[in-house]
Amino acid sequence: MNRILINKELGDRSITKKFVKEAVEKILEHLNIDNVEISITLTDDSTIKEINRQWRGKDKPTDVLSFPIDEKPPKYRYRILGDVVISLPYAKKQAEEIGLPYREEIIRLLIHGILHLLGYDHERSEKEAQVMFSLQDEIFENIRSYFSRTTQT
């Protein structure tokens, strides 16, 4: 059992907390990860731009940011993985540009962010990028097929 905390700062009805929680559960299940706490924040471009500027020195919006914590406080049931922040407007625009349904782009960004929390990094080397993106694609296809079968989510 995992603890998934979702903070949705926008009224975008096409991306529900239920959908995000279910997607995160499926991602963690695919990775055989249990008893973790993860925080997902769904926000706007100006908020993610400010976070990106403050923490990465990049004064521009982005699709997803990850902040790994990876600690297990004494007597706390869960290992805390960290926080994933996604800009919904950025994701929607990006989905349109690459020809992916909006909800599938959110799934892709959740996978990407969670992999970063687990220590994967596509910016360190080409080999690490290959490993990360290969795993990301594998998980995406698995989760995508699950959600295509359960379109009532």
UniProtKB/Swiss-Prot annotation:
GO terms under cellular component: cytoplasm
UniProt keyword Endoplasmic reticulum present: no
Domain of life: Bacteria
Gene Ontology molecular functions: metalloendopeptidase activity; RNA endonuclease activity; zinc ion binding
Entry's cofactor comment: Binds 1 zinc ion.
Lineage: Bacteria, Pseudomonadati, Aquificota, Aquificia, Aquificales
Name of a matching Pfam family: YbeY
PROSITE patterns: UPF0054 (PS01306)
Subcellular location: Cytoplasm
Enzyme Commission code(s) on record: 3.1.-.-
TM helices/strands, residue ranges: none
Protein's UniProt keywords contain Zinc: yes
Known role: Single strand-specific metallo-endoribonuclease involved in late-stage 70S ribosome quality control and in maturation of the 3' terminus of the 16S rRNA.
List of residues binding Zn(2+): 112, 116, 122
GO term, biological process aspect, one: rRNA processing
Keyword set, alphabetical order: Cytoplasm, Endonuclease, Hydrolase, Metal-binding, Nuclease, Ribosome biogenesis, rRNA processing, Zinc
Name of the protein this chain belongs to: Endoribonuclease YbeY
